[in-house]
């Protein structure tokens, strides 16, 4: 069985998940979107309202911001990336996922990574960084620096929803810094 077939089976299993209380309030399990053969994996925090409705990650305002940021450095969000979240179900009122919810969901992400075998992982926001890297530092301190995990290059960036709240493109501001971070991702991506 190919990795792609294994990934499809994993996603079918994931859509049936009832391992935490988020299963009681979700509309859809939001597994992933994008190219399963991509070398870039983008991991966010969790689905929002629009994602819960559609069943796909990053389709709301934050998703449009992410697409725009990626396109600005000539990374195609659907062809060059595979996009998922730490938790696959929407936390009520878009709250931060609890530790229990993260612990229930992280095995799904680990299996996705096994099947995808990405060369680069972009972690969008502090929840993704804390959950995946087990690092508790402000995203403002850790973003923009490459971290190695299991021979994969990992780049923490600000979450796109944070950029919506901080829209200035002035040098040194979050949106400008994210653009710099994604240029680093593009440079490494182009080297493969």
Q: What are these regions, as identified by a protein language model?
A:
Residues 1-192:
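A polyanion-binding, active-site-adjacent surface
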